[in-house]
């Protein structure tokens, strides 16, 4: 190859835009990064670039990735000081050249045809975002399960306009990026970035992109595997960064206020805040949970009182109880305890009444059985058979006489 031809080849390579840019933020993921990258590099869709942004790892993560770059030219390694996954994803987007963006966590992995399925849906339907089903994997037990609370009540293999899901956006989709493919041009025009937060840094980007998308399509197939119960994951240390979720909530609420459908979006958002907060209060240490609830108080007080504004009584009850101060909550808890005791007595009385009625029913069944037995005895007696034999001819004569 001449020098000129080599230059032309290099220029052509640089001008070629891969179909998908896979962006992987990685922090101390030496135990999982090889499996993650192997699942990406073995995709049936080969026209991809893989951008790994090492977020200041202190283990062998970066060196493992660097070794792989020598084997596969589609991998790029970017290093940065530890600034969190949100900043790492933004860094990856800055250099991404693909028509589509896919964000994968360094401890997760994907099915061999994941990117092909996602791109096929996006290309055929013109989607700004494509979402597919995912499966959870317990890192301690090896248990797997379908994440069936994602893609809740959505149609598949068709273009969904925001008008379909705007009033239940936060219930139909989850606030993580790894089950979604994004059209890069759409993300660039939206100006959306991941928040620079230690945890919950993806919720703002994901939910706001769903608000702004021209159309979303969904694939009814498990394409992603999400590792849970990973002790090295930052999600396992949320007590150190509980405020990040609050910051994400406030940013999302601000974005909602700018939208034409803000009223419908806010109703869905309120229900999400309540359920997410219920999970947080249930999983955070008690002292941290108190701080969380204190920070959330302004949002709770702004939520409507009527039960019709909530997905179910569960959310309405959460809002009602969480918005009470300590003294009112004590009174409410005492009242509920009394109500529970009264209901227990009512249940006991009803059970006793059911037992009494069952006893009467058994007695009636016994009487009916006795009568049936007596009737059978009559039919089988000699006197009945003799009488029946004598009367039968007379009945026949009487019938002919008519």
Go through each PLM region and give its residues.
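Cell-envelope/extracellular polymer assembly enzymes that use nucleotide-activated donors
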Residues: 18-21, 49, 204
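Short, well-formed alpha-helical segments that are part of the catalytic scaffolds
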Residues: 29-42
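A conserved acidic beta->alpha catalytic loop
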Residues: 39, 54-63, 81-82
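Short beta-strand/loop segment that forms part of the nucleotide-sugar
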Residues: 47-56, 76-81, 106
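Glycine-rich, basic loop-to-helix element that forms the pyrophosphate-binding segment
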Residues: 80-96
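Donor-binding/catalytic cores of nucleotide-activated saccharide
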Residues: 85-88, 106-219, 224-241
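Short aromatic/hydrophobic "clamp" motif used to bind/position activated sugar donors
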Residues: 101
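Boundary detector for helix-to-coil junctions that initiate low-complexity/charged tails
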Residues: 320-402
């Amino acid at each position: 190859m001449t020098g000129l031809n080599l230059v032309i080849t290099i220029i052509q390579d640089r001008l070629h835009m891969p179909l998908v840019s896979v962006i992987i933020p990685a922090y101390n993921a030496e135990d999982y990064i090889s499996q993650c990258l192997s699942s990406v590099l073995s995709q049936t869709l080969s026209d991809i670039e893989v951008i790994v942004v090492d977020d200041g790892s202190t283990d062998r993560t970066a060196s493992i990735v660097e070794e792989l770059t020598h084997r596969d030219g589609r991998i790029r390694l970017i290093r940065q000081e530890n600034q969190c996954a949100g900043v790492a994803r933004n860094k990856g987007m800055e250099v991404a050249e693909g028509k589509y963006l896919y964000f994968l966590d360094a401890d997760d992995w994907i099915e061999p045809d994941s990117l092909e399925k996602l791109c096929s849906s996006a290309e055929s339907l013109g989607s700004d975002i494509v979402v597919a089903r995912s499966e959870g994997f317990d890192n301690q037990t090896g248990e797997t399960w379908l994440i069936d609370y994602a893609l809740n009540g959505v149609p598949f293999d068709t273009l969904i306009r925001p008008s379909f899901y705007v009033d239940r956006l936060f219930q139909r989709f989850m606030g993580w990026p790894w089950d979604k493919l994004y059209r890069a041009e759409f993300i660039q025009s939206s100006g959306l970035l991941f928040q620079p937060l230690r945890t919950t840094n993806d919720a703002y980007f994901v939910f706001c992109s769903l608000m702004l998308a021209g159309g979303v399509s969904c694939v009814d197939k498990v394409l992603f595997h999400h590792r849970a119960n990973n002790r090295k994951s930052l999600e396992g240390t949320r007590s150190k960064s509980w405020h990040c979720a609050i910051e994400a909530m406030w940013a999302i609420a601000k974005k909602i206020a700018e939208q034409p459908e803000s009223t419908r979006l806010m109703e869905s958002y309120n229900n999400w805040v309540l359920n997410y907060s219920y999970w947080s209060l249930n999983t955070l240490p008690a002292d941290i949970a108190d701080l969380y609830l204190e920070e959330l108080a302004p949002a709770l007080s702004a939520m409507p009182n009527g039960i019709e504004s909530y997905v179910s009584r569960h959310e309405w009850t959460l809002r009602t109880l969480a918005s009470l101060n300590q003294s009112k909550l004590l009174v409410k808890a005492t009242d509920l305890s009394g109500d529970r005791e009264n209901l227990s007595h009512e249940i006991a009385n009803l059970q006793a009444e059911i037992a009494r009625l069952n006893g009467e029913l058994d007695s009636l069944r016994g009487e009916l059985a006795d009568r049936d037995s007596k009737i059978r005895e009559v039919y089988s007696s000699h006197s009945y058979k003799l009488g029946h034999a004598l009367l039968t001819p007379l009945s026949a004569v009487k019938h002919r006489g008519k």
